[in-house]
């Protein structure tokens, strides 16, 4: 396994649809206050704001844990235990210079390396075209995380979407609405980043959850989504620009039959950790189980 990514959870073959997933929101699933108090988080945030005054804080869902139901059991197959966190807390924990120490201290104090970390839950998509290519984007060098690297479409589900005009509280966030936001957010990210019409996208299937070890184990839920457009049609939509076009500088495609061998190619080193997690889960859950001997991935030329 690539050291930049670890798998927290792998869904059953094919992936799980929305109706097979439950979410439990509780303050018990929030991060623990830092051992020396949270003043360090405030100091980091204020320093970042001075250097980047355009930054703004926003609430995020925090993944505490996830449990699959026993094989063959009826009802929902996956339970997500979620708390609330924020972008500010992410910068002050997962992205702080003391992140490794916080993980060690969490293991010592609570038996959980993530106990003191914000761990905002992200989403990503293995997006397949009608002519059997997966879609990749080259991240802009202006973005804060993984600038210039190759990614899959993705982002974050937003608690604020379920509480417009208010401050999200655990008791106000019904589990099924949270699951719906999780699934709809990955579709919205595809629409915004690749500029695709929503009606061209299938309902997502959850492949699993991967941790980004370069940001102290921040988790991302990775999905499989099919698009009814060909790769060339997707390229044309992307080129016409979308709401988040500034976040990437180019689009390219890898044949799905060759994705199994992606780890053995030079392209793998260009993938950001979240994209690596998405591809590993795609290969294990949705991709060809045979992993037939294939050559290097056939790429449609990048822009």
Swiss-Prot record:
Q: Name the needed cofactors.
A: Mg(2+)
The protein in question is named Uridine diphosphate glucose pyrophosphatase NUDT22
The record's Gene Ontology cellular component field reads: nucleoplasm
Positions of the UniProt region annotated as Disordered: 148-168
Family annotation (InterPro entries): NUDIX_hydrolase_dom (IPR000086), NUDT22/NUDT9-like (IPR055295)
Instruction: List the keywords (alphabetical).
Output: Hydrolase, Magnesium, Metal-binding
Molecular function, one GO term: metal ion binding
Top-level taxon of the source organism: Eukaryota
Signal sequence coordinates: none
Listed under catalytic activity are: UDP-sugar + H2O = UMP + alpha-D-aldose 1-phosphate
Transmembrane stretches in the record are none
Gene responsible for this protein: NUDT22
Q: Where is the Nudix hydrolase domain?
A: 118-285
Task of the protein: Hydrolyzes UDP-glucose to glucose 1-phosphate and UMP and UDP-galactose to galactose 1-phosphate and UMP. Preferred substrate is UDP-glucose.
The record's similarity note reads: Belongs to the Nudix hydrolase family.
Species of origin reads Homo sapiens
- The EC number of this protein is 3.6.1.45
